[in-house]
Design a protein with these regions (language model features):
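Conserved donor nucleotide-binding strand/loop of the catalytic core
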Residues: 32-45
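Short, small-residue-biased leader/transition segments that mark boundaries at the very start
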Residues: 1-6
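Short internal beta-strands
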Residues: 16-20, 93
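Acidic helix N-cap motif at the loop->helix transition within catalytic regions
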Residues: 23-30
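Conserved alpha/beta core of the MobA/IspD/sugar-nucleotide pyrophosphorylase nucleotidyltransferase superfamily
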Residues: 118-191
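Short, flexible, basic/aromatic active-site loop/helix in glycosyltransferases
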Residues: 101-127
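Residues at the starts of beta-strands that form the adenosine-phosphate
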Residues: 13-15, 88-89, 159
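Conserved beta-loop-beta/alpha segment of the NTase-like Rossmann-fold superfamily
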Residues: 45-105, 122
């Protein structure tokens, strides 16, 4: 997100963009040059984040954000950052709108969790750097592949605080997502 890379976020000292080697030139053309470096991704999300973490000598907080969520707002970033400063681990999320069902291997419903206790976790996810490194080391020792950074912290026994975000901080992963993203951008421009 351009907000994460923005120079009007003085709390962010450095931005590491994790991408494929073939995408560096295209990404470089889109992003501001100051504060931004590129790191090659791995085979999994966890490996990609590990590649980035390995390039960092030391920092207070590690902010992890999905490039597929370009509509994150400055307020969401700052609110999550402030919560992580207080608690050591925080993530942005929204309450689920749909009723969620648990199914078995035969696609039969086996349970209905209480929707009021379900959050769809988004990014940014922000953690104390020392805690995150411990969580990565533990996961590596266990041989687990975690698709979510909050789960790494849960595995370490560290509670993660949730900051209620915006539904507009959507993940753009399919062609059907693009018209919605365009509508959000147009609405923001009109404000």
């Amino acid at each position: 997100s351009s907000d994460v890379c923005s120079s009007d976020l003085p709390q962010v000292d450095e931005v590491l963009v994790v991408c494929r080697p073939a995408d560096v030139d295209a990404m470089s053309a889109l992003l501001p040059q100051e504060k931004v470096s590129f790191v090659f991704g791995g085979k999994t999300r966890q490996e990609s984040v590990q590649n980035a973490v390995d390039t960092i000598d030391d920092c207070d907080l590690l902010l992890i954000h999905d490039g597929a969520r370009p509509l994150v707002t400055r307020d969401e970033i700052l609110d999550t950052l402030h919560r992580a400063e207080e608690t050591g681990a925080a993530a942005t999320g929204v309450f689920v709108k749909d009723t969620i069902k648990v199914i078995n291997d035969d696609y039969e419903i086996t349970d209905t969790p209480d929707r009021s206790q379900l959050i769809a976790i988004q990014t940014p996810q922000i953690f104390r750097f020392d805690l995150y490194k411990q969580a990565m080391e533990k996961a590596k020792a266990q041989g687990g592949n975690f698709t979510d950074d909050c789960k790494l912290m849960e595995n370490l026994g560290v509670p993660v605080s949730v900051v209620i975000g915006e539904y507009t901080n959507m993940k753009i992963t399919t062609p059907e997502d693009l018209p919605m993203a365009e509508a959000i951008l147009k609405a923001r421009e009109a404000e």
